[in-house]
């Protein structure tokens, strides 16, 4: 049933939130993986013994994609063709998806840049490893902030249509 508070198009915004969460977070994860992978490939030719330690940025980039998956599944779980879906919920889900997705892009970019340069520096100087991991953790937390905000937003939905 369509009303002013629950128009027929309100689910579009919810689905846009699902899409934004997945697309942007995976874009960030893919970029971070590609950049860090390029550095690992360059290092592996000179010091193959440090390749396994150098995989940390790639793993951390992959976690950014998982944040987007979690948010997308939660948003999609709130949507059903059998139940009313308010415009308020649509906007909340869109903002939650954008919060997770866009912080995922920022975190993925930061992880990729730090991972690429950090791994190359680690090849030359072993003491760099701890500093690189600390900076990677701070970059990963950017994506985690978005997930936390998205989860808080997602709990505020309301499908009251009267």
Curated annotation (Swiss-Prot):
Lumenal compartment segments: 1-11, 76-93, 154-162
Residue spans, topological domain Cytoplasmic: 33-54, 115-132
Protein's UniProt keywords contain Cytoplasm: no
One of the protein's GO biological processes: proton transmembrane transport
Entry keyword set: Hydrogen ion transport, Ion transport, Membrane, Transmembrane, Transmembrane helix, Transport, Vacuole
Family: Belongs to the V-ATPase proteolipid subunit family.
GO cellular component, one term: fungal-type vacuole membrane
TM spans (from-to): 12-32, 55-75, 94-114, 133-153
Protein name stated in the entry: V-type proton ATPase subunit c'
Subunit details: V-ATPase is a heteromultimeric enzyme composed of a peripheral catalytic V1 complex (components A to H) attached to an integral membrane V0 proton pore complex (components: a, c, c', c'', d, e, f and VOA1). The decameric c-ring forms the proton-conducting pore, and is composed of eight proteolipid subunits c, one subunit c' and one subunit c''.
UniProt-annotated site: Essential for proton translocation, residues: 140
């Amino acid at each position: 049933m369509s009303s002013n508070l629950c128009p027929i198009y309100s689910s579009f915004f919810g689905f846009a939130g699902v899409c934004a969460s997945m697309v942007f977070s995976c874009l960030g994860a893919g970029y971070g993986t590609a950049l860090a992978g390029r550095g690992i490939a360059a290092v592996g030719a000179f010091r193959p013994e440090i390749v396994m330690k150098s995989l940390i940025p790639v793993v951390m980039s992959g976690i950014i994609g998982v944040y987007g998956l979690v948010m997308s599944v939660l948003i999609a779980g709130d949507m059903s063709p059998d139940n009313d879906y308010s415009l308020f919920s649509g906007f909340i889900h869109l903002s939650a998806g954008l919060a997770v997705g866009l912080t995922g892009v920022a975190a993925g970019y930061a992880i990729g840049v730090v991972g690429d340069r950090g791994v190359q520096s680690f090849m030359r100087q072993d003491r760099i490893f701890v500093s690189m991991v600390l900076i990677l953790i701070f970059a990963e937390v950017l994506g985690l902030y978005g997930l936390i905000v998205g989860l808080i937003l997602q709990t505020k939905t309301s499908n009251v249509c009267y």
